[in-house]
Amino acid sequence: MSLDAVGSLETKGFPGVLAAADAMVKTGRVTLVGYIRAGSARFTIIIRGDVSEVKTAMDAGIHAVDKAYGAALETWVIIPRPHENVECVLPIAYNENVERFRESTERPLIGSSQNRS
């Protein structure tokens, strides 16, 4: 069982998923691990990270979709510790393409004024 949470957000319209993804990685110490075109004008993004960070990022993503012109939030979910069987089958695992972003989110923050970039 993974210790990292997984969050998934689905929108109608690409601008909404783009706004959500950007807000999520800027707000929470999370890694964007996947993107799925779920159908005509429906898009899903998947984030991973600490449970509290995924919750913070998801809130920011939902808010960003609400602000994006013409976008609609379809659904979202947070799984605190997905079972390894779920990680093995569904496209939610970290991969080599996103590993450098994962490493940057796992570095400890020192002091409250440190930039999260």
UniProtKB/Swiss-Prot annotation:
Subcellular location: Carboxysome
Domain of life: Bacteria
SUPFAM superfamilies linked to this entry: CcmK-like (SSF143414)
UniProt entry keywords in alphabetical sequence: Bacterial microcompartment, Carbon dioxide fixation, Carboxysome, Photosynthesis
All copies of domain BMC, residue ranges: 5-91
Family statement drawn from the similarity comment of this UniProt entry: Belongs to the bacterial microcompartments protein family. CcmK subfamily.
Domain comment in the entry: The tight homohexamer forms a small pore which is positively charged.
Description of how the protein assembles with itself and partners: Crystallizes as a homohexamer. Interacts stably with CcmK3, forming heterohexamers that can make dodecamers. Heterohexamers have a 1:2 CcmK3:CcmK4 stoichiometry. Upon expression in E.coli forms large aggregates.
Protein name: Carboxysome shell protein CcmK4
Gene (name only): ccmK4
